[in-house]
Each structure stands twice: as structure tokens, then as C-alpha cells.
UniProtKB/Swiss-Prot annotation:
GO CC, any one term: cytoplasm
Intracellular or extracellular location(s): Cytoplasm
Family note: Belongs to the gamma-glutamyl phosphate reductase family.
Protein name: Gamma-glutamyl phosphate reductase
Signal peptide: none
Major localization class: cytoplasm
SS bond partners: none
GO MF terms, alphabetically ordered: glutamate-5-semialdehyde dehydrogenase activity; NADP binding
Enzyme class of the recorded protein, top EC level: oxidoreductase
Catalysed reactions, semicolon-separated: L-glutamate 5-semialdehyde + phosphate + NADP(+) = L-glutamyl 5-phosphate + NADPH + H(+)
Alphabetical list of SUPFAM superfamilies matching this protein: ALDH-like
NCBIfam families from the UniProt entry: PRK00197.1 (NF001221), proA (TIGR00407)
Length: 423
């Protein structure tokens, strides 16, 4: 029987110890985890557990895409090990001092960066998340309680044993990383209410998981990783820029959260831009769901294919996660901004050579990341120079956009005096 109170208490105690660990010790633990992933015996144990999960998934009729996401291979373990070593090489945010000042009364004041404490992470059928989250939490001084999808229970348990062994070998508390290996869904609800021990919940999965966590939690929940992504092609856009940016944003990895969902095109350039974009995307088997004006322009340009279909209004509020793109022709920047304000908050981009229009777009669009003449696919911790990420938050509190090491910390005020008393 899984006792979450015990797990929470052990995590809290381990987190207090971990918060005081020097960077060198934390890095040594991360290096030990990476080495363990590459060790033949350890890898064999993890792969055997994963093979059992995959076999059970196939028997349950899971989709090929889901089976692929949950499958580990020696090559994927090597990539996870490399990512863990990358985290070891990142700057440690814990203990950083900032906003230092000396007050008129002589008090010396600064803020000091500290871990959040205990992080609960609930995720779906991606066993690699087990190690990714563990690495980021360890480096930022946080304990973690992990709950992977029921499809990968064996894989998560095997990876957590490997991590805990590495922690013990390097003198860090093994309870800093724990997994709930019981697939009972009721335990997820219990975790969401474990506010005596857990400081924050980070869900990683689909819209249903995020909604469930928001509705059931008595703990702060940082949601994100879901949202409709837009590109607006301005009348001053460079056609040579438009086609490769749209292609990259839509085609490179259509199933991820920063992939393009809706293309908005200025009416003044739609007749020129749309055929070139459509020709490129159709060659990559993208289905285009277009409004009436876009359909007329594409028909006039000679396009007649079942891959181009009339858009429904509901197609403009959908995160497709597939080779599907909705397209709308707009009168200009104001209409594009109105559309994005209604549907966007994740990753939104403008393609234009006009600096004033670009700045107006950046100022007006209220999303976690806004791009000028660049693909939405760059809304990623690794791509934005953070090294790694635990999630992409679309909230405004506590963090926004890619959440990396610094976003897994808070701060405390430190006030130093010389016998000061308040008047």
C-alpha cells in the first residue's frame, strides 16, 4: 500500500538537506546518474522493465505514436544521460545574491535564491521525463515526488531506483527523488492535496491532465505546455522568410506544444504568399483548413486537392498536435492581434520587415513567448539558452515560458544590521 504521507515527509526532510548541498556534490550525483544510465547492467534492467510496459501497452491497444513515446532504447538512454550531464554543467542558481542595497539607516539588504522545496510532477507516457525532472530538481536543490502515467509504471520505478542508488553513492539523500509506482488514480488526487509537504505541482501532459490538476489541487499548480500557436504574415513580410519559417513551425515536430496551429495572412499579400506556403506544406502531407477568402485565392491559383478543406470556426481554437494547419486571411495587424488575443497564450510570431509593426506586435501579444521573424519552435528551454526545461508555463505566476533551473527557485530576503532596532 502506498502511503503518500510517508513519501511526503521523507521528501520534505530530504529537501531540507538537499537545499544545503554544495554545487559540486549535486553535480557529482548528476554525473553518477548519467554513468548509471550507460552502465550495461543498469541499462538492461531499465530496458527490461520498459519492454514489459511496451508489451502491456500493445496488448491494451495503445496507438503506435504512444508506444513510440513510451519506448526506451540504448540510444535513447544515451541521450538521456547526455542531457543529464548537460544539466550538471549549467550554473547553479541556488545561493545567488541579487538586488543588494544599503539602506539609509545602514541595513544591508539582498535577496538570495533558494529552492522551492518539494516539487510534485505528474506526467504521462514519457519515461524520459523521470530523469529529466530528477536532474533539474536535484541541481536546483529541490526534492521531487514523481507520478508517471500508468502505462510506464515499471519504467519509472526502474529509473527511480537507478537515480536513488546514484544519490546514495554520492552522499545525497536518496529520498530526494521518489516515485509513486502504484497506478491507482486516486493517489494522484491525494498528491494534489498533499499541501503539508508539497510546495508546487507541475503537470506535464494534455489539456485534460492540466484541467484535472487545477480543479483538484490544494497546492499551487503551474500549468502550460498547451495552447494554440500562431504566425502572422504581415504585408511587409519577406516571402523567402515565410515559407521556411512556416514549414519549420508546422512540419518539424507537429506533435509538440510549440508547433504552429494557425496561420494568419495579411490580405494585401495573401494572393502571393498563400500559394507558396500551400505548395510547400501539401508536399509534406499537411491538411489545410482554410477560411473562405483563403479558399478562393487557392482555387484561383489552381489548387484542387482534398488536403485543402473549408475551415470551421472551431478549427481556430485547436492545438492540433498533427499535420493540420488552419489558415485565415486578415485585414491587417489589428485583426491579427484580436484573433491571437482570443485564442493564443503560448507561442506567437510575426513575420515582417517593418520594425514598427514588429514592435507593436510584441507589445500587444500577451503570450509566454513572442517571436519576430523566427519559428515558434524556439519556445524551448534548450533553444533559448536555458540548457533544459521542466515545462513551458503559460501562466504569469510563478514563472512564464520555459521553466529551467532558475524558475525552480524562489528567494528570501536577507537583512544584515549592526544592532539595528526599529524606531
Amino acid at each position: 500500500m502506498t502511503n503518500l504521507e510517508e513519501i511526503g515527509a521523507r521528501a520534505r526532510a530530504a529537501g531540507r538537506r538537499l537545499a544545503l548541498m554544495p554545487t559540486e556534490r549535486k553535480n557529482a550525483a548528476l554525473e553518477a546518474i548519467a554513468a548509471a544510465l550507460l552502465d550495461e547492467a543498469n541499462a538492461a534492467e531499465v530496458l527490461a522493465a520498459n519492454a514489459d510496459d511496451v508489451a502491456a501497452g500493445r496488448d491494451a491497444g495503445l496507438s503506435p505514436a504512444l508506444i513510440d513515446r513510451m519506448t526506451l532504447t540504448p540510444q535513447r538512454l544515451a541521450a538521456i544521460a547526455a542531457d543529464t550531464r548537460t544539466v550538471a554543467g549549467l550554473p547553479d542558481p541556488v545561493g545567488e545574491r541579487f538586488d543588494a542595497t544599503v539602506l539609509e539607516n545602514g541595513l544591508r539588504v539582498h535577496k538570495r535564491r533558494v529552492p522551492l522545496g518539494v516539487v510534485g510532477v505528474i506526467y504521462e507516457a514519457r519515461p524520459n521525463v523521470t530523469v529529466d525532472v530528477a536532474a533539474l530538481c536535484l541541481k536546483s536543490g529541490n526534492a521531487a515526488i514523481l507520478r508517471g502515467g500508468k502505462e510506464i509504471t515499471r519504467s519509472c520505478a526502474a529509473l527511480t531506483r537507478l537515480i536513488q542508488n546514484a544519490l546514495a553513492q554520492t552522499g545525497l539523500p536518496a529520498d530526494a527523488i521518489q516515485v509513486i509506482d502504484n497506478p491507482d488514480r486516486a493517489l494522484v488526487e491525494q498528491l494534489l492535496r498533499l499541501d503539508r509537504y508539497v510546495d508546487v505541482i507541475i503537470p506535464r501532459g494534455g489539456a485534460g491532465l492540466h484541467r484535472f490538476c487545477r480543479e483538484k489541487a490544494s497546492i499551487p499548480v503551474i500549468t502550460g505546455g498547451i495552447g494554440v500557436c500562431h504566425i502572422y504574415v504581415d504585408q511587409a513580410a519577406d516571402l523567402e522568410m515565410v515559407v521556411p519559417i512556416v514549414h519549420n513551425a508546422k512540419v518539424q515536430r507537429p506533435s509538440v506544444c510549440n508547433a504552429l496551429d494557425t496561420l494568419l495572412v495579411h490580405r494585401a499579400v495573401a494572393a502571393e504568399m498563400l500559394p507558396a506556403v500551400a505548395r510547400d506544406l501539401l508536399a509534406s502531407n499537411v491538411e489545410l483548413r482554410v477560411d473562405e477568402e483563403a479558399m478562393a485565392l487557392l482555387r484561383a491559383a489552381g489548387f484542387d486537392t482534398p488536403q485543402i478543406v473549408p475551415a470551421q470556426e472551431s478549427d481556430f481554437g485547436v492545438e492540433f498536435m498533427a499535420l493540420i494547419l488552419s489558415i485565415r486571411v486578415v485585414a491587417g495587424l489589428d485583426e491579427a492581434l484580436e484573433h491571437i488575443a482570443r485564442f493564443g497564450d503560448h507561442s506567437d510570431a510575426i513575420i515582417t520587415r517593418d520594425p514598427a509593426t514588429a514592435e507593436a506586435f510584441v507589445q500587444a501579444v500577451d503570450s509566454s513567448a513572442v517571436f519576430v521573424n523566427a519559428s515558434t519552435r524556439f519556445n524551448d528551454g534548450g533553444q533559448l539558452g536555458l540548457g533544459a526545461e521542466i515545462a513551458i508555463s503559460t501562466q504569469k505566476l510563478h514563472a512564464r515560458g520555459p521553466m529551467a533551473l532558475r524558475e525552480l527557485t524562489s528567494y528570501k530576503w536577507v537583512v544584515e544590521g549592526d544592532g539595528h532596532v526599529r524606531a
